[in-house]
């Protein structure tokens, strides 16, 4: 073989190498996309959940109770944590110790109000993003040490391994809703919410709410609903569809004469005007804080927004570390109650987002309609 032919052959080989690299990248990327979609499955609707605990107590009409709603942000969000899906940088909690510290502190915060009921959201049970910490176990152990509580867990999603960001993939996530009750939870049900379709469902993940039944001494039931509506990959129509499904279940229970309390992270501007209140002059719009559609709330139900100590935001935008008075904040979390539940006090508590990207909401209530005093002129 001549020198000219050898040189020509070498050039041909070098020319093939980048093509092979491109082909391998395409095959790997295609294989990953196929894995994500083929491994995708939704948890079944109307799934019976198994409450745990030894409480045998029934709730009473006319007695004051305290309930807390708290999104724990899967134990990652210290006040300087920024999240990649919110234009921030980080995709995982900084360390296992940081996760444990955040969950311990947020749980202690909830317990500090001596609650009768607590609705937690974003509780991880073995996720890459939270360093495989079993957050449910930490919370349950603390509540067991504080008194006699029943608890029930509803898994929101079990996602495929997300290979993004490339430098530190978000990984696989397994997370859900955890309800705590001093009173006997006789049964609980997981309802699957309508979510995005197509590629968007990978971002939206699965969504659900849990319906827990607690007997009341008058023969009725207290229906506790723990929910976390979609934040990403959604639009107004889908958000309304989720609320309409939720409201249909709430109304069905109210029509039976039961007492209904729904709490959690609604991923809407809960008071409708909190975005402008906390961020005057802002032109920012996000799908997770569109105004709450008050017009679809069914008759017989009320949002609890008469805050005893004024407006306090319940979440921050995590594109940057939290700076009071500068960071974008809004009210997403709260309670909606049936008319046979009297809200005696409600307040969002300013915890400066030190251990989660949400602030807790505390409500005191009684079962039974508020008494009204009529006056007559003589």
Locations of regions flagged by a protein language model:
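A well-ordered secondary-structure block
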Residues: 158-222, 226
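Surface-exposed cleft-lining segments at the edges of enzyme active sites
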Residues: 89-96, 123-127, 193-201, 228-237
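Conserved beta strand-loop-helix elements of the APE1-like EEP
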Residues: 141-145, 171-188, 215, 327-342, ...
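Solvent-exposed loop/turn segments at secondary-structure junctions
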Residues: 74-75, 124-127, 156-160, 185-186, ...
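Intrinsically disordered, low-complexity repeat and linker tracts
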Residues: 372-378
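Active-site beta-strand/loop signature of hydrolases that rely on acidic residues for catalysis
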Residues: 66-72, 103-132, 180, 212, ...
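N-terminal, active-site-proximal structural segment of metallo-dependent hydrolase catalytic domains
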Residues: 2, 6-141, 145-146, 153-174
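Metal-dependent phosphoesterases centered on the DNase I-like endonuclease/exonuclease/phosphatase
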Residues: 233-234, 238-339, 378
């Amino acid at each position: 073989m001549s020198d000219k032919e050898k040189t020509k052959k070498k050039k041909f080989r070098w020319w093939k190498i980048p093509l092979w690299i491109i082909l391998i990248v395409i095959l790997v990327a295609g294989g990953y996309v196929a894995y994500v979609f083929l491994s995708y499955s939704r948890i079944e609707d109307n799934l019976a959940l198994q409450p745990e605990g030894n409480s045998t107590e029934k709730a009473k009409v006319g007695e004051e109770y305290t309930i807390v709603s708290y999104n724990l942000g899967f134990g990652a969000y210290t006040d300087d944590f920024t999240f990649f899906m919110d234009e921030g940088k980080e995709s995982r909690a900084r360390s296992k110790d940081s996760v444990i510290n955040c969950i311990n502190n947020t749980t202690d915060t909830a317990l500090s109000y001596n609650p009768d009921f607590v609705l937690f959201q974003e509780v991880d049970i073995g996720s890459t993003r939270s360093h495989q910490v079993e957050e449910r176990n930490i919370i349950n152990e603390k509540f067991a040490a504080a008194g006699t509580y029943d608890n029930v867990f509803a898994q929101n999603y079990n996602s495929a391994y997300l290979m993004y960001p490339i430098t530190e993939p978000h990984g696989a996530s397994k997370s859900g809703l955890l309800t705590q009750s001093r009173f006997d939870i006789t049964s609980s049900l997981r309802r699957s919410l309508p979510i995005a379709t197509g590629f968007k469902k990978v971002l939206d993940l699965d969504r659900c709410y849990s319906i827990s039944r607690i007997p009341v001494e008058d023969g009725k039931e207290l229906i506790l609903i723990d929910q976390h509506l979609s934040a990403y990959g959604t639009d107004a129509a889908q958000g309304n569809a989720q609320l309409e499904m939720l409201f249909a279940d709430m109304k069905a229970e109210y029509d039976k004469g039961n007492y209904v309390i729904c709490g959690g992270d609604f991923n809407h501007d809960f008071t409708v005007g909190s975005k402008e209140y906390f961020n005057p002059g802002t032109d920012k719009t996000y799908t997770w804080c569109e105004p709450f559609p008050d017009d679809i709330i069914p008759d017989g139900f009320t949002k609890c927004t008469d805050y005893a100590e004024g407006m306090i935001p319940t979440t921050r935008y995590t594109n940057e570390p939290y700076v009071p008075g500068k960071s974008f904040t809004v009210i997403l979390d709260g309670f909606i109650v049936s008319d046979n539940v009297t809200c005696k006090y409600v307040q969002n508590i300013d915890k400066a987002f030190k251990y989660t990207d949400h602030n807790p909401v505390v409500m005191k209530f009684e079962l039974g309609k508020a008494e009204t005093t009529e006056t007559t002129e003589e």
